[in-house]
A protein has these predicted regions:
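Amphipathic secondary-structure elements and adjacent low-complexity, charged linkers
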Residues: 1-7, 89, 97
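Single-pass alpha-helical membrane anchors
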Residues: 3-29
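Cell-wall polysaccharide-cleaving catalytic domain and substrate-binding groove, primarily
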Residues: 22-176
Length: 176
């Protein structure tokens, strides 16, 4: 086979591949609105808590009518914006402290995400959050002024990423 015919064959295969990919793409677009197709592409790989605007993965309960909550994805609450999901997290932390007398990072996270079959990583969670906060997990009471830093660390642990600016988190906490 000559170099010229090899190059021609290679170019032909590339063109066929491009045309096939274009036809598949056009077919998919014709079956779904462009917005849906874009959401699918954008949402690929996005952690559930970020997609749901529920960055601390608060479980859905019908009796909890959180401000900004739009429903559930089956297990977790869905909010209209991350600020409302963060607000709910701050309200829960405050409730745990005021009504149940929990104060340390260990106390709060043991209530938040109890150890068990669904959460074998509680000790890692506690260490991660305490380290990010710069405090010992059992020796310091968490102050409400520390909620933004604590919630940022919780978001990072829950989702593997913490995509929000600290002022967004602080605003969500201030809504509580």
């Amino acid at each position: 086979m000559s170099v010229k015919s090899f190059m021609w064959t290679r170019a032909s295969l590339l063109m066929v591949s491009v045309l096939t990919a274009w036809q598949v793409f056009r077919h998919r677009l014709s079956k779904a609105p462009i917005q849906t197709a874009l959401e699918e592409v954008i949402g690929m790989g996005t952690p559930r808590g970020i997609r749901n605007h529920n960055p601390t993965n608060i479980e859905y309960h019908a009796r909890n009518d959180w401000l900004g909550q739009t429903g559930s994805d089956g297990r977790f609450a869905v909010f209209t914006s991350p600020e409302y999901g963060i607000r709910a997290a701050a309200k829960l932390l405050r409730r745990y402290q005021q009504r149940e007398g929990l104060g340390t990072v260990r106390d709060l996270l043991s209530k938040w995400a109890p150890a068990g079959q669904d959460n074998p990583h509680l000790d890692n969670y506690i260490r991660h959050v305490a380290k990010r906060m710069g405090i010992h997990p059992t020796q310091h009471k968490v102050l409400s002024s520390q909620y933004p830093v604590m919630i940022a660390a919780m978001i990072e642990f829950e989702n593997g990423v913490q995509p929000y600016e600290m002022n967004t988190i602080a605003y969500g906490v201030s809504l509580a």
